[in-house]
């Protein structure tokens, strides 16, 4: 695999951060700006991960509504097994679990009737408990 600037990794390190640059040119400043804004998915054992909530990226603000749409696309790295579960949380409670056995996912979820106050978030879990992708939460707009 390669890093942000196209350099081949010297060692096999399964840890990665997927950072949303929002169309900015990859640079130290744009990466720091995105990380500070929380536009990140921390992952271990994944080749790809992308999660949105009502079209917003992780770390962003979303309008809390009666029905919210989450989209996830993810792929495990070679030799790291399959995606086994997707969990959706409202604040600190699991509100949906999707059990799977797939190397790649491209799925939509509609979440309704939740009573969360602060945020909604998702976790993508693999066979090995240490293989996980965790996006920054989607925070509810105030007011």
Which role fits each region the language model picked out?
Residues 1-143:
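Charged catalytic cores and adjacent phosphate/nucleic-acid-binding surfaces used
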């Amino acid at each position: 695999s390669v890093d942000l600037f196209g350099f081949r990794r010297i060692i096999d390190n399964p840890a990665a951060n997927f950072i949303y640059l929002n169309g900015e040119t990859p640079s130290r400043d744009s990466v720091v700006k995105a990380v500070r804004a929380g536009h990140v998915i921390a992952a271990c054992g994944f080749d790809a991960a992308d999660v949105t909530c009502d079209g917003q990226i992780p770390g962003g603000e979303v309008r809390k509504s009666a029905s919210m749409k989450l989209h996830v696309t993810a792929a495990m790295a070679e030799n790291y097994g399959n995606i086994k579960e997707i969990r959706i949380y409202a604040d600190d409670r699991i509100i949906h679990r999707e059990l799977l056995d797939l190397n790649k996912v491209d799925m939509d979820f509609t979440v309704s009737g939740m009573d969360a106050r602060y945020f909604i978030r998702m976790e993508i879990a693999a066979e090995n408990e240490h293989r996980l992708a965790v996006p920054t939460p989607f925070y509810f707009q105030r007011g």
